[in-house]
Amino acid sequence: MAALNELKDIVVEGLVSDIFKMERAYHILSVIGSNADQLNDRALGNFGELFGAFQGSLEVDAVLAVARVYDSPSKQYPTRCLRRALSLMEDRVAELPEIAERYNTKLSLAFLGENSSVVGSVDLGRDAFVARFVPAFREILDSEAVSKAVDSLKYVRDKRIAHNEAAEPHGPTWEALKSLINHAQNFVGVVGWAFFNTVYVHDGAYFLSDDAQRPSRALRRLVERIRVTGRGDR
């Protein structure tokens, strides 16, 4: 089951890890942004510079995480990315096990549309499913919206983060990054049910998103404590 172990490594150590990093960064940054007035208030401790530094690091973390998910496969440096996972499934389908959880695999394919032929292929077995799922998912990755967002993402990574070139940072919006990560979550959800019998997506919700929000909840509590303590000192 070398192919299964390799696929699981790409998904667990690559995609799942980077999805978590992006979501964690996004939620922490959201809390910092929504509490900027309090964090910059001199009377409450003047923590603006501290959290400004956190912001810069978290933004880089988020960009790099999503960029890794959408990296191009490399024979020299095997990347844990969506396209490598798709190629592995396609090229080594005979080495993968039969679909472990057909019912939930079909439910997790809802993002493709109820009438998708991919959903019906699950009941036909592993070979038929992979033969239809891989092209369908590649079609998503090759869509104009995704291609445009990925190009913008890699521009920021290569020109501004990796090399610090004197170029205008035409980066993707947070909504675009969230959309890119949502595609990755959908992929992980399908493969998790199909080949690992592992729950990543249930009833349309990505299970680990709640864990990714825990640091931001802690930050909200910290901001509230700063606010209360500051009021008491006045």
Predicted regions, residues:
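Amphipathic alpha-helical interface segments
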Residues: 1-149, 172-234
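Histidine-centered, metal-coordinating catalytic motifs and their short helical/loop contexts
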Residues: 143-169
